[in-house]
Design a protein with these regions (language model features):
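Local sequence-structure signature of Cys/Sec-based thiol-disulfide redox active-site neighborhoods
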Residues: 4-29
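A structural signal for the main folded, soluble domain(s) of proteins
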Residues: 14-15, 61, 99, 224
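Short beta->alpha junction loops/turns
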Residues: 18, 81, 129-132
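Structural alpha/beta surface segment adjacent to cysteine/selenocysteine redox centers
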Residues: 23-112, 183-191, 195-199, 204-207
Length: 229
């Protein structure tokens, strides 16, 4: 049964804080929420795990992982409040993708936790609790196993159909945000529609690189992207 494009009031949003594309999409979906009373459930997806290189440790086997560690903090915060997880993703996303900072570093993370009025022990408590690994891994495994996820952002609609994207920069605001939301809902209403994609020209790639400069300066990892299905 097709879902009406007009009656979507809740989505699951899968993200990895490392991903600049997911951050832009999160800004857009927050704007949709502001204008449309949309409810967002934040879920975790690990680019470090999905793109794991043979011979490397899984992110849950490392003392610190660039995306996994902040998501463990998010999982701990989400237990008490989805809005606190929301604020955490907003803070760490802004730090990395706008300010060019490294929110996976303890001092930066503790500063950001203070900004969102999280418990002062959140970093230490979350990382001392091995079940935060389990929660991040459960979200990731669900995205891969149930929705064939290969990257982020992923939107999951009430119909339980997943969509990769929209991949957009900059995040549209105001009426433009609502126009894109209508497109996303319409896309979801066609069960046989699997992909719409704009090829990136050299000019497009230069534009994207300029938009992502803070992230490119701050990151300490090499991007790895496996082929998509």
């Amino acid at each position: 049964m097709k879902e009406s494009p007009v009656d979507i009031q809740h989505i699951d949003f899968y993200f990895d804080p490392m991903c600049p594309w997911a951050y832009q999409t999160s800004l857009w979906i927050r704007e949709v929420r502001r204008l449309n009373d949309l409810e967002i459930s934040w879920k975790f997806f690990s680019l470090e795990e999905i793109n794991l290189v043979d011979g490397k440790k899984h992110p849950w086997e490392r003392d610190l992982s660039y995306g996994w560690t902040p998501m463990r903090i998010g999982a701990w915060l989400r237990r008490s409040s989805m809005s606190m997880c929301d604020d955490w993703y907003g803070a760490i996303g802004r730090a990395l993708h706008v300010d060019g900072r490294r929110p996976y570093e303890r001092d930066v993370a503790i500063e950001l936790l203070g900004q969102i009025h999280a418990p002062p022990t959140a970093w230490d408590d979350a990382l001392a609790d091995p079940t935060t690994h389990d929660e991040v891994r459960a979200d990731h495994d669900r995205a891969v196993g149930q929705y064939a996820g290969f990257g982020v952002p992923i939107l999951v609609f009430p119909s339980n159909r997943a969509m990769f994207g929209p991949v957009v920069v900059p995040a549209p605001m105001g009426d433009e945000a609502l126009k894109l939301w209508e497109l996303a809902k319409a896309y979801n209403s066609f069960p046989g529609l699997f992909e719409i994609k704009t090829p990136k020209t050299g000019h497009d790639r230069d534009y994207i690189a300029a938009a992502f400069t803070p992230y490119l300066v701050a990151r300490q990892w090499k991007s790895v992207q496996n082929s998509t299905p």
